[in-house]
């Protein structure tokens, strides 16, 4: 199954279309995922944990879910076992469960269905990116949040991802804060350095 991004007129706006099969194949066979990311200096999970801690009402947001949780790097940086993890890859779910970093971990495709309950806060660290998810899944994420729920996302600042993935057309969330750009792969020595921001979104409640 492929999930392109569309503009309001129904035109595909992204060249690299998200492929469920490709993502599953990649991550189901990636046994050294966490080791490889840390060796390349991936640090976005630490930045997102800092943003979580800085939310003024974080203690009141008791129901928290982590989308595309991988092996649980965000939960490790968060240092509390009060989050629920979801991932498309059964291998990542297995590794994350074994880590004990989440209260619970389940396999789920957010492009197909909302989460099974509503949360106060949803995090998506690494879910959105080139050849990854597009803005088309945002209605399902919004449906998984309580009224005035918060979504934290990493947002690539390279390769035109924001425009190609249809974010300028989404109506499910309003942007309320963003960090400065930061180099997300500190150990990368080849090619152009890649930068991300952490964006804070509030769910737009239906009138």
Question: What are these regions, as identified by a protein language model?
Answer:
Residues 148-157:
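Conserved beta-strand signature within the Rossmann-like core of class I S-adenosyl-L-methionine
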Residues 188-207:
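Core SAM-dependent methyltransferase catalytic element
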Residues 65-113:
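Class I SAM-dependent methyltransferase SAM/SAH-binding core
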Residues 1-56:
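Conserved class I S-adenosyl-L-methionine
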Residues 121-134:
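A short SAM/SAH-binding and catalytic strip from SAM-dependent methyltransferases
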């Amino acid at each position: 199954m492929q999930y392109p991004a569309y503009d309001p007129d129904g035109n595909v706006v992204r060249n690299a279309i998200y492929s469920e099969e490709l993502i599953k194949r990649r991550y189901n066979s990636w046994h050294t995922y966490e080791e490889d990311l840390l060796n390349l200096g991936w640090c976005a999970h630490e930045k997102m944990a800092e943003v979580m801690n800085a939310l003024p009402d974080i203690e009141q947001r008791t129901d928290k879910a982590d989308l595309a949780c991988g092996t649980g790097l965000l939960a490790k940086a968060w240092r509390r076992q009060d989050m629920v993890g979801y991932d498309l890859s059964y291998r990542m779910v297995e590794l994350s469960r074994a880590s004990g970093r989440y209260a619970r971990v389940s396999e789920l495709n957010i492009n197909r269905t909302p989460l099974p309950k509503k949360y106060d806060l949803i995090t998506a660290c690494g879910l959105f990116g080139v050849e990854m998810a597009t803005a088309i899944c945002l209605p399902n994420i919004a449906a998984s949040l309580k009224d005035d729920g918060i979504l934290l996302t990493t947002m690539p600042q390279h390769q035109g991802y924001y425009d190609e993935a249809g974010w300028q057309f989404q109506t499910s969330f309003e942007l309320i804060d963003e960090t400065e750009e930061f180099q997300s792969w500190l150990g990368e020595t080849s090619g152009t350095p890649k930068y991300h921001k952490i964006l804070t979104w509030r769910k737009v409640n239906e009138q």
